[in-house]
Structure formats: structure tokens, C-alpha cells
Amino acid sequence: MLSCWCATAFGWGKIGHDAIAYIAECNLTPKAKKNIEKYLGGRSIVYYASWMDQVRHTPAYRHTNTWHTNKVDAGGNYVPDPEGDAMTFLDDCIAKVEDYRNQNDSTVTVSIRFIVHLVGDMHCPGHVKYPWYKSFKFTLSGKEYGLHNYWDEWALTLSNKWHYLEYGHQLDRCSKREKRDIAEGTPRDLSLIHI
């Protein structure tokens, strides 16, 4: 159902999430796009790209706060978070969507929304939590940034002032062969690119 996610984009914050979702949507098969839009009430996946960030502070979704990142050790090896993390939750959501015939529509709908957001989070270097994650600071043009804050808030706005469509057009440059190779991998495979 979810046929291809292109790994050429970077992204975070609303513009980055929208750009990644747009690139993903452009690479969906027509059948997959139609099925997804059926569950999303006819809306594009871009519409829901930042949804998880919007609901994470509500009582119903507060438990998802740890699900936006992945922890790694000093060697860059993935370390599952006992409270949950992006990788574990993404695997769970994908399994629910793949088993859509045995799930109720609301479960599939919410799982698709989570997948769209988590794929964007997993493309963000600031969402890989190294042991020094909170203490890593750097200065750029006289301003101090934290790693996560820079990637979530500033990386895209300090470079090009593009709309998500422009990022999509500039970054979705994979050849057909590269796209096939990406589609054969799993989200777990793709997440290792940033670790």
C-alpha cells in the first residue's frame, strides 16, 4: 500500500515535513495514493505531515512524545528506548497498515498519519539521539544552536527560503533505479543512513 519513500530529502519543522511527504506522495503508485487518500478523507499526505507534532501535547497522544527520535550509542548503534521510539513505533504502524483488512478504518487512518510524520522525523539528523545529544552546541554566524533545535527550526530557513514544493522539485532527483533500490529497503534500512 505504501509503495515508496524517497530518501533524498532532509527535513524538519513544517516545511521539511511537508517536503518529505510531497516527495513521498510523488513516488507513490496511483493505486497506493488512491488507497491512502481514501483513509485520509481525500486529503494529501502532505496535509498530515506535521500532524503528529500538533497532537503530541494533547492528553490522547502525550504518550507519543518519545516516538519522534531514535537513540544510538557512542558507536552509532541503534538502542531501543523502553518508552518507545520512532523505529519501534514506525514498524508497528506499518504492520497495522499492511494488515488493513483486519484493522478498523480509524486504526489504519491514524497509522498512516503517524507513518507520514515519522518518515520525516527519521530523515532528520537532529532526531538521532547520541549520548551527547543535549549538550552538543555550536555557533553559526554568531548565534549558538543546539543540534535538535537547529535541525528542527533553522536548517531549512537559514539556507533557502523555499516552499515545500521547491524542496520537492530540487531534492527528488533519484533515478528510476535508485528509487527502486530505495523502495526495496525498509524504513529501518533507511534510518541507518543518518546513524
How would you label these PLM feature ranges?
Residues 193-195:
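Conserved small/polar residues in nucleotide/adenosyl-binding loops
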Residues 10-149, 158:
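Soluble secreted/lumenal catalytic domains
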Residues 129-187:
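Flexible, glycine-rich surface segments
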